[in-house]
């Protein structure tokens, strides 16, 4: 660097009266050659009025300056002393940079990035430091004068100076210290930390569609944050305990159980100072008798009355202090006056398990300090950039040719491109068939040869239906040239569905084996783009590598070139104008004014009884079964199903899944237009049917939007978390970045912290699987932008999320360190590592469920389990008050090397079933423990306390004894009796006596345990049969000390079990052994006609019937819950039960061999 030198200097204050330099002086009037083409002729010699005013105000400020002998202002620089100009490049242009306290002319190359330009400037002006102004470049941002005469902030420091719009008689940039700018930078840094990837790099890789998507996400974030609760118990983060339904009365069976066990409510209270300091050791206990009519307010009134009777009060409490109830051991509250206490899930579970519900009485004013009103959202820089771009495009359109619109041409997206001035038509204005031609193929995985030919297949499909197919003539790989002619599909453009997908498959063949095709790659793309316009012209597509056809539902090309570098360029015939897809108004117009109607007799569907009595109804049922079995219906059969569309719309809305897979619907615009119009008044389908419509079987955006809207109406804030995993999978089948599924997930996450917390980790585990191809992978970028929007709307909790992310990173590192070590060495290594970093993992929300708070880590209990992946078992103290009544310790298993998504899905289905049964007043005592995937093959599993596997129970010293226990029908019953306090009669105590046993108390505990086992066995028997859970053995069946039975490890579901020599190992429909039946009979010999066994059978049938009634999705019944009517369903499962009851010998044999193998 060099700069012009001057003579002696004086550093002093001066104002405008001391000969300050004019900003419009001749010295600064040079215009960079590179920018000359950008300057407006009208602004060449006239300074902008707003800029002139700003400069006049700036010149009247008090500021420092240097004066030389000739009186000219100068700069005091770090490297060269005094100079009149900062020279960063000898051959650059001159630009004026206005600092907050002085002005400097700078000669620089316009190829330099703004970040580097700013850094070099501040390296030079260190001696010019003045007053409170910082000289750190990161504290400043640039501003410039834009095309509209506005001073705007430049947020992207990675762009070059040549990209800026510098106007006026000379180019100028302004530096300022923004208040919100640093906040945005810090927030972006925090979000990058949470994502595990830089937002700056992500911004560089997103295209126009993703920029629009990002702006739409921000709009939805702002709208949701404005509408969500932010005060008191309505705060979006306030943890209200899940409840079943409003106005529900206490079930009779539950009331009888509570009275028999003499259960009551236990409330704990402490002084204000102790509560404020979170000191819970000394608490007063008040017991209140159970009343099935109690709600939170009535229980609270009883508590206050008891408090007054005991003369307990705190003088520090104000007279108007309000109280709320917190469940013992959980950050979960019960506050709703319209909800009875027995309707709350946590309270109901305690009562069903013969435990007294415990509450901590909290002061509302202290509790709500943790749920303050969030600070206003800070509008991110990309929103202002996007709005500016839209405004510029509007200006471009306004000075162009007026846009010609055809009738009813409402736009799906507001289009502000300059090309919007081109004439626009709709798809229905075209009078031709779809035409495509191949252009070239690159990136072949082999050397070109005269003996190898290349072929290409084009297919247009919707959902599971192929509408048209063309195979292109093969050409030698040495000359990959096709004739310049288009191939015409048998698909009339007017009848092409708006969500039609083009599939391209490339294959090779050898001249010696011309009948054998070797697939090289494939790709699917929507024939309409994100603006809802028909794709036209040449398109280059990166192909995906060969996969089974069942996995080819992915829409979008392989931007990251995962697995293959093969790409193909195709050309879709152009029509000289922009072609929009039809819109809602056009569909309605066509349906109202169509000329011809189908000759098929239509069923109105209003009278249900008349419809099911129609002979055609039986045929409809048969055709639905035929369709679901995989048989393709012929045209006459499809027309029969279609003729029942009005009945289906009003009476059996789930059959929309079948209608959406009829070919006659998607090959005639009259039919799919009518279906679209009918959706406006379509009865809501079941949750199961809506989720099916969001899977890969349906690609139509109108139907998918309908499914999301109906699903959103049916899911409450308390059960939506059960469906997050399938909804995230549904994102992968969306043809465009913007989707109703994504917007629904974002809205729900921002409206409930608990839902958002789980969604964050599920989304993060998805992007971790794609991190190796991050910037070029469309799925990665979509999910990352969705996560960014959530984190921007959840800024209050982002620091807590960062702590959890850091915890996962540390545990991943430690799990890698202990792999391969012996059991003892691995345990010591784990504990040594935890001693140095455990403080980082304490006083933090549990990633599994934020209602639990990790307190102090119990390092002495940390172990490395002996399985192949060597998972870590970690223990924390539960930091919530009175955790000893519920869960004293939070125990988790951290796994590195297993995909936990299938386990999580099965456990969520179990949780859904549990909710359905409880709503029907059947508590099956299920134990759907928590599982959370947190990265690529990384996740955590909740440990159910005080339990053992059946193998651990039967395991005894010596192989013979262990094998003997496997066939002993009483060994599990003996173990339960021991946990209840009974002493094994065969073990005699030595003289002096043994422990005294309270026989009555032990008997009471034993019968309670038997009751828990009975109901949990009912639940898991029915649930595992419905889901087809296989590979059941004594190492994945668990038993708790209080009698609950449950399953773990769900690697084989939907009937896909292990086989040996072609023979299915699991030959029973569900596990029902003699050991189980012995417990059910309280230790007595098994008798199928006994009262206990008959009760068990009746409960199984009732549980199955409840599930049959709730699985309204008919075709799912053919897979899981068989039986056309309730009577037939009950009869069917009675046969299943008898098969399991009579086949217990096979399970006993499996357990024997499993014990001998793993002893």
Curated annotation (Swiss-Prot):
GO CC terms in record: cytoplasm; phosphatidylinositol 3-kinase complex; plasma membrane
Gene3D superfamilies assigned: 3.10.20.770, C2 domain, Phosphatidylinositol 3-/4-kinase, catalytic domain, Phosphatidylinositol 3-kinase Catalytic Subunit, Chain A, domain 4, Phosphatidylinositol 3-kinase, accessory domain (PIK)
Top EC class of this enzyme: transferase
Keywords: ATP-binding, Kinase, Nucleotide-binding, Transferase
GO molecular function, one term: 1-phosphatidylinositol-4-phosphate 3-kinase activity
Domain PI3K/PI4K catalytic positions: 858-1159
Domain of life of the source: Eukaryota
Residues of the PIK helical domain: 607-793
Start and end residues of each stretch annotated as G-loop: 864-870
C2 PI3K-type domain residues: 430-588
Region (Disordered): 1-28
Family annotation (InterPro entries): ARM-type_fold, C2_domain_sf, Kinase-like_dom_sf, PI3/4_kinase_cat_dom, PI3/4_kinase_cat_sf, PI3/4_kinase_CS, PI3K-type_C2_dom, PI3K_ABD
Catalytic activity field: a 1,2-diacyl-sn-glycero-3-phospho-(1D-myo-inositol) + ATP = a 1,2-diacyl-sn-glycero-3-phospho-(1D-myo-inositol-3-phosphate) + ADP + H(+)
One GO biological process term: phosphatidylinositol-3-phosphate biosynthetic process
Start and end residues of each stretch annotated as Catalytic loop: 1028-1036
Record region (Activation loop): 1047-1073
Boundaries of every PI3K-ABD domain copy: 79-179
EC number: 2.7.1.137
Family: Belongs to the PI3/PI4-kinase family.
Purpose: Phosphatidylinositol 3-kinase homolog that regulates longevity and diapause. Promotes cell survival during embryonic development by recruiting akt-1/2 to the plasma membrane through the production of PtdIns(3,4,5)P3. Could function in the development or neuroendocrine signaling of the dauer pathway. Mediates susceptibility to enteropathogenic E.coli infection. May negatively regulate AYI interneuron neurite outgrowth. Plays a role in aversive olfactory learning when an odor is associated with food deprivation.
PANTHER family in UniProt: PHOSPHATIDYLINOSITOL 3-KINASE AGE-1, PHOSPHATIDYLINOSITOL KINASE
Protein's UniProt name: Phosphatidylinositol 3-kinase age-1
Organism for this UniProt entry: Caenorhabditis briggsae
């Amino acid at each position: 660097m060099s700069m012009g030198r001057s003579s002696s200097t004086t550093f002093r204050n001066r104002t405008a009266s001391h000969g300050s330099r004019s900003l419009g002086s001749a010295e600064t009037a040079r215009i960079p050659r590179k920018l000359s083409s950008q300057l407006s002729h009208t602004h060449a010699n006239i300074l902008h009025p707003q800029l002139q005013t700003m400069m006049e105000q700036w010149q009247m400020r008090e500021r420092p300056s240097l004066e030389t002998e000739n009186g000219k202002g100068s700069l005091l620089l770090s490297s060269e002393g005094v100079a009149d100009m900062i020279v960063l490049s000898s051959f650059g242009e001159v630009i004026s940079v206005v600092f907050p306290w002085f002005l400097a002319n700078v000669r620089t190359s316009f190829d330099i990035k703004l970040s580097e330009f700013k850094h070099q400037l501040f390296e030079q002006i260190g001696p010019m430091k003045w007053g409170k102004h910082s000289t750190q470049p990161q504290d400043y941002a640039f501003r410039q004068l834009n095309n509209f005469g506005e001073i705007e902030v430049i947020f992207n420091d990675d762009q070059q100076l040549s990209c800026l719009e510098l106007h006026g008689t000379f180019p100028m940039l302004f530096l300022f210290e923004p208040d919100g700018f640093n906040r945005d930078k810090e927030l972006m840094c925090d979000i990058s930390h949470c994502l595990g990837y830089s937002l700056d790099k992500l911004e560089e890789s997103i295209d126009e569609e993703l920029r629009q998507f990002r702006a739409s996400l921000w709009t939805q974030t702002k709208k949701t944050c404005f509408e969500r609760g932010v005060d008191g118990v309505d705060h979006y983060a306030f943890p209200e305990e899940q409840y079943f339904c409003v106005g529900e009365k206490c079930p009779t069976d539950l009331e009888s159980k509570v009275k028999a066990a003499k259960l009551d409510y236990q409330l704990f209270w402490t002084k204000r100072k102790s509560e404020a300091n979170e000191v819970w050791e000394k608490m007063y206990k008040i017991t209140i008798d159970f009343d099935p009519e109690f709600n939170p307010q009535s229980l609270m009134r009883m508590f206050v009355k008891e408090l007054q009777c005991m003369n307990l009060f705190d003088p520090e409490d104000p007279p108007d202090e309000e109280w709320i109830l917190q469940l013992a051991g959980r950050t979960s509250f019960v506050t709703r006056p319209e909800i009875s206490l027995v309707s709350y899930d946590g309270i109901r579970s305690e009562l069903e398990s013969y435990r007294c519900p415990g509450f901590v009485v909290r002061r509302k004013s202290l509790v709500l300090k943790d749920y303050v009103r969030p600070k206003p959202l800070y509008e991110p820089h990309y929103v202002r950039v996007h709005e500016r771009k839209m405004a510029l495009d509007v200006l471009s359109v306004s000075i162009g040719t007026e846009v010609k619109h055809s009738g009813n041409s409402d736009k799906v997206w507001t289009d502000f491109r300059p090309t919007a001035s081109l004439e626009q038509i709709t798809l229905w204005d075209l009078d031709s068939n779809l035409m495509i031609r191949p252009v070239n193929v690159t990136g072949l995985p082999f050397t070109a040869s005269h003996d190898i030919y290349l072929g290409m297949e084009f297919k247009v499909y919707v959902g599971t239906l192929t509408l048209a197919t063309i195979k292109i003539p093969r050409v030698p790989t040495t000359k990959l040239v096709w004739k310049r002619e288009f191939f015409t599909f048998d698909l009339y453009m007017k009848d092409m569905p708006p969500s039609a997908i083009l599939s391209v498959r490339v294959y090779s063949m050898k001249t010696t084996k011309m009948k054998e095709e070797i697939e090289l790659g494939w790709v699917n793309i929507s024939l309409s783009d994100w603006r809802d316009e028909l794709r036209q012209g040449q398109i280059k597509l990166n192909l995906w590598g060969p996969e089974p056809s069942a996995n080819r539902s992915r829409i979008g090309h392989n931007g990251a070139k995962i697995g293959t570098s093969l790409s193909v360029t195709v050309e879709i015939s152009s029509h000289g104008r922009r072609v929009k897809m039809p819109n809602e108004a056009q569909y309605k117009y066509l349906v109202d004014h169509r000329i011809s109607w189908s000759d098929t007799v239509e069923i109105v569907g209003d009278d249900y009884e008349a419809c099911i009595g129609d002979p055609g109804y039986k045929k409809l049922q048969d055709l639905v079964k035929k369709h679901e079995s995989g048989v393709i219906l012929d045209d006459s059969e499809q027309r029969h199903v279609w003729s029942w569309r009005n009945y289906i719309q009003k009476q059996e809305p789930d059959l929309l899944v079948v209608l959406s897979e009829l070919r006659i619907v998607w090959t005639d615009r009259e039919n799919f237009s009518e279906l679209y119009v009918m959706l406006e008044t379509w009865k809501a389908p079941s949750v199961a049917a809506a989720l099916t419509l969001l899977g890969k079987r349906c690609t139509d955006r109108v139907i998918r939007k309908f499914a999301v809207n109906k699903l959103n109406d049916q899911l409450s804030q308390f059960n939506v978390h059960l469906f997050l995993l399938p909804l995230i999978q549904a994102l992968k089948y969306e043809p465009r970045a913007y989707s109703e599924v994504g917007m629904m997930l974002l809205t729900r996450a921002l409206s409930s912290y608990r839902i958002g917390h789980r969604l964050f980790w599920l989304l993060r585990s998805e992007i971790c699987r794609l991190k190796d191809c991050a910037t070029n992978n469309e799925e990665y970028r979509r999910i990352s932008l969705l996560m960014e929007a959530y984190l921007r709307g959840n800024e209050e909790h982002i620091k807590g999320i960062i702590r959890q992310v850091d915890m996962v990173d540390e545990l991943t590192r430690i799990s890698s360190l202990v792999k391969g070590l012996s059991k003892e060495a691995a345990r010591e290594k784990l504990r040594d590592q935890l001693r140095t970093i455990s403080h980082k993992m304490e006083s933090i929300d549990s990633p599994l469920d934020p209602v639990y708070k990790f307190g102090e880590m119990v390092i002495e209990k940390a172990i490395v389990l002996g399985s192949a992946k060597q998972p870590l078992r970690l223990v924390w103290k539960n930091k919530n008050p009175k955790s000893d009544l519920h869960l004293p310790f939070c125990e988790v298993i951290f796994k590195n090397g297993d995909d936990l998504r299938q386990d999580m899905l099965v456990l969520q289905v179990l949780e859904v079933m549990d909710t359905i049964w409880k709503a029907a007043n059947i508590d099956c005592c299920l134990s759907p423990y928590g599982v959370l995937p947190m990265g690529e093959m990384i996740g955590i599993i909740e440990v159910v306390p005080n339990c053992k596997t059946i193998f651990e129970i039967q395991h005894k010293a010596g192989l013979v004894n262990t094998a003997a226990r496997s066939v002993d029908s009483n060994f599990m019953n003996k173990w339960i009796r021991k946990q209840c306090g009974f002493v094994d009669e065969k073990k005699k105590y030595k003289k002096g006596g043994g422990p005294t046993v309270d026989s009555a108390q032990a008997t009471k505990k034993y019968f309670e345990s038997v009751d828990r086992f009975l109901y949990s066995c009912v639940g898991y028997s029915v649930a595992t049969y419905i889901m087809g859970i296989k590979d059941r053995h004594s190492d994945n069946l668990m038993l708790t000390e209080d009698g609950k039975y449950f399953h773990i490890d769900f690697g084989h579901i939907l009937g896909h079990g292990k086989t040996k020599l072609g023979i299915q190992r699991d030959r029973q429909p569900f596990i029902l052994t003699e050991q189980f039946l012995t417990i059910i009979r309280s230790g007595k010999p098994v008798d199928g006609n006994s009262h206990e066994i008959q009760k068990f059978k009746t409960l199984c049938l009732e549980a199955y019937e409840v599930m049959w009634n709730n699985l309204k999705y008919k075709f799912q019944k053919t897979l899981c819950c068989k039986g056309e009517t309730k009577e037939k369903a009950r009869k069917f499962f009675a046969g299943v039960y008898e098969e399991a009851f009579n086949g217990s010998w096979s399970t006993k044999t499996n357990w024997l061999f499993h014990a001998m193998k793993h002893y």
